[in-house]
Amino acid sequence: MTMGNLDFITSLHTRTKRDYVGRVTDADKAECATVARRWGKDYWDGDRKYGYGGYKYDGRWSIVAESMIREYGLSDRSSILDVGCGKGFLLYELKKLLPGAKVRGVDVSVYGIENSKEEIRSCLSLENANQLSFADNS
C-alpha cells in the first residue's frame, strides 16, 4: 500500500495559537538545534525553543489514531510499528482503540521512552531508524 500525500498531522498544528515564526527567530538557532538534537529532557520537557516545551499529554493524538485506523483499515489483528515514536502518544491512542493490536515504537531518545506513558512504555524501545531489529513483514 502506498501512503501518497496523506497528512494526519497538520490539523493538530493549525489548532494551536503558538507563534511558530517567533520560536525560530527569537533564539540562537545553532544553540537550539544543538540542544534539540540530543533528544533529552531539554527537547521534551525544557524550554519551548528547544522542542516540545514540556506539554502534558491532552489526548490530541486520538484524532490522528482514528484517521489512521480508517485510512489503513487497521484492526485488533494489526501489527503497527511507529518509527520515531517519541513518548509514544500515537501508539497509546492506537492501543486504546485497538486493544488487540500488536504495537511497537522505536525512538533514539532515552528520555522520551523513559518518560512515556506508563501504559505503553513496555512497547517502546531504543533503536535507530536506519538499523531496525525487526524482520520484514513481522
What residue spans do the PLM features occupy?
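N-terminal auxiliary segments of SAM/dcSAM-dependent transferases
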Residues: 1-34
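Non-catalytic substrate-recognition/targeting regions of SAM-dependent transferases
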Residues: 37-41
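Class I SAM-dependent methyltransferase Rossmann-like catalytic core
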Residues: 46-60
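Conserved alpha-helix/loop element of class I SAM-dependent methyltransferases that forms part
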Residues: 58-75
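A general structural motif
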Residues: 75-77, 100
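Conserved class I S-adenosyl-L-methionine
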Residues: 77-86
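Class I SAM-dependent methyltransferase SAM/SAH-binding core
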Residues: 89-131
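A short acidic, Gly/Pro-enriched loop at the edge of an enzyme's catalytic core
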Residues: 130-138
